[in-house]
Swiss-Prot record:
S-S pairs: 13-118
Annotated function: Binds to actin and affects the structure of the cytoskeleton. At high concentrations, profilin prevents the polymerization of actin, whereas it enhances it at low concentrations.
Name the record gives this protein: Profilin-3
Signal peptide interval: none
Gene3D superfamilies reported for this sequence: Dynein light chain 2a, cytoplasmic
Amino acid sequence: MSWQGYVDDHLMCDIEGHEGHRLTAAAIVGHDGSVWAQSATFPQFKPEEMNGIMTDFNEPGHLAPTGLHLGGTKYMVIQGEAGAVIRGKKGSGGITIKKTGQALVFGIYEEPVTPGQCNMVVERLGDYLLEQGL
């Protein structure tokens, strides 16, 4: 399966049991900031935004004082999993980022999708990629 297939079929799909509810945007991005695949709605990000995200995975708490920025949007960093998952909130939506061996899996959501549903979709694919050595 192509990387775009993972984004289209495993991230931008209907949430299990909630037909028509899906993430707003999603992407798989290499640790170096290169986009492997993304939805048409994924924001154009700046290199320094990706650097900040990678720094937070290596130094958990790095983004907490300033917030997580992606495509010029600021998210308040909320409880994640140090070195593995970063979660952010903005209004009725938010973001989940799962780190794998070689990539970052991004999911962005708005209501009616819940934070837990976004976490489930993003982390399930991230865990699968980790199992595959990616």
